[in-house]
């Protein structure tokens, strides 16, 4: 199972986190599948690669609590729901994507 979670970077007392897609069995600093963004809690800056996040969420990846909150602020889940609604409407009409 794949999770979207934070990977700690930076130096002592000055943490910066990468948001990564990683296998559940890997440790926090383990090898990730893909980097999908970063989060700086001190400057309160966030960057998300939205297509990559939507790809992993569409494939069944589960975000951790903190990544879920960050994604919620960035309104990622609204985009995911819009994409799912379009796909459902097209499949009902006979189009398969």
Swiss-Prot record:
Q: What domain of life is recorded for the organism?
A: Eukaryota
Instruction: Enumerate the GO terms in the molecular function aspect.
Output: structural constituent of ribosome
Chief place of localization: plastid
**A Pfam cross-reference name:** Ribosomal_S16
GO cellular component terms attached to this protein's record:
chloroplast; mitochondrion; small ribosomal subunit
**Location of this chain's protein in the cell:** Plastid, Chloroplast
Which InterPro entries does the entry mention?
A: Ribosomal_bS16 (IPR000307), Ribosomal_bS16_CS (IPR020592), Ribosomal_bS16_dom_sf (IPR023803)
The GO annotation for biological process reads:
mitochondrial translation
Q: Which terms are listed as keywords in the entry?
A: Chloroplast, Plastid, Ribonucleoprotein, Ribosomal protein
HAMAP family (alphabetical): Ribosomal_bS16
According to its UniProt record, which protein family does this protein belong to?
A: Belongs to the bacterial ribosomal protein bS16 family.
Q: What is the protein name stated in its UniProt record?
A: Small ribosomal subunit protein bS16c
Q: Which organism is it from?
A: Piper cenocladum
The gene behind this protein is: rps16
